[in-house]
């Protein structure tokens, strides 16, 4: 029989589809590069690498209170650099609209760039570039993937 704490002894590189990064209540009300930083493993990836599997935008909220505004016109790109250089995009480089994030309790997986299917990334953080903002909005962003090494 296995030990009851066997799973707790494993690390992220022993599991697939681990949540690599998460930010809660991040504003999409302002355009710009690196509006939101997504530190990988809370900044603990060190010299390792990871494979991206999914990036989910969820739980929209109205920062001014009241009904959640539709984010259907919001446009975001996720990058490995904070300079806005779209050659470093891990999602669609031209940005992706959040057409499914239109009310409370809605979510959307972002389309990963073609390079994400064959690349193990080493960046310590990912960055959100907001191309088109929506006033008084905030969302949660989750990044899922596999840790290749620490």
Q: Residue ranges of each PLM-predicted region?
A:
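Surface-exposed, low-hydrophobicity beta-strand/loop segments enriched in small/polar/acidic residues
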Residues: 2-150
